[in-house]
Regions:
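A conserved amphipathic terminal alpha-helix motif
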Residues: 120-166
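Solvent-exposed residues in well-ordered beta-strands and their adjoining turns
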Residues: 8-12, 57-59, 108, 122-126
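Short, highly charged C-terminal tails/helix-capping segments
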Residues: 150-173, 177, 181-193
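Intrinsic-disorder/low-complexity, polar/charged segments enriched in Ser/Thr/Lys/Arg/Asp/Glu/Gln
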Residues: 1-6, 13-15, 51, 83, ...
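Beta-strand/loop substructures that line and gate deep hydrophobic ligand-binding cavities in soluble
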Residues: 81-139
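Hydrophobic ligand-binding cavity/cleft-lining segments
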Residues: 1-50, 192-193
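Short, surface-exposed coil-to-beta transition loops
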Residues: 2-4, 64-70, 98-104
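Glycine-rich portal/gate segments that line the openings of hydrophobic small-molecule binding cavities
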Residues: 28, 37-92
Length: 193
């Protein structure tokens, strides 16, 4: 069985890639429903390859299980798609009844809109209880997708300011009546120019 999302995110693919590799973004995506906490003391700034043990708490209060997030990345595919793959497994809680957990996230430029991101997310599960857990996981994925769409515009870096856009920079084009560097006022019809 599987749960999947296919979304257009209002941010460029580089920003989306940084976001899905961020434990902070993960925490914001699931909040306030689920609160992931590192079992290793603290989350890294950016997810790296390997295992990361996490405890999940409902509403930040009630432990609902642990998860081994086991990550690998494909960042340089010929088709330009970047992939993050979580092949981890539930460590405790109801999800341990699943026999398979395979989660893949793909980032690519949106077709015809290179400043936006095509985001694809697929979770495959199996086991005798998979049919019973499918709907709760599907619901959580819908929440996650809605949060991604909401948060994506905030993921971009602020643009670098050009030299004459920097605060306090003198562009030489003072507006009429605006104070100049020496405190006098510039008037567009000043005949002393």
């Amino acid at each position: 069985m599987h749960v999947q999302l296919k979304l257009i995110l209002d941010c460029d693919p580089d920003a989306a890639w940084r976001a899905i590799k961020s434990p902070t973004v993960l925490t914001e995506l699931y909040g306030p429903l689920l609160q992931p906490e590192s079992q290793e003391g603290a989350f890294p700034t950016i997810w790296g390859p390997g295992s990361h043990a996490v405890t999940l708490k409902a509403l930040g209060l009630v432990p609902v299980g642990g998860q081994d997030i086991r990550l690998d990345f494909q960042e340089h595919r010929a088709d330009g798609v970047r992939m993050m793959h979580d092949s981890g497994a539930p460590l405790s809680g109801p999800l341990t009844l699943l026999t398979r957990w395979d989660h893949r996230m793909a980032i690519a430029p949106a077709p015809g809109e290179p400043t936006k991101t095509l985001y694809r997310d697929r979770l495959e599960i199996s086991g005798a209880v998979a049919p019973a857990l499918w709907y709760p996981l599907w619901s959580l994925w819908q929440w996650r997708g809605a949060r991604m769409v909401q948060m994506a515009p905030t993921w971009a870096f602020d643009p670098e300011l050009e030299k004459d856009e920097e605060p306090g920079a003198n562009t030489g084009d003072a507006a009429a009546g605006a104070p100049t560097d020496d405190g006098t006022r510039f008037d567009a019809d000043d005949s002393t120019l």
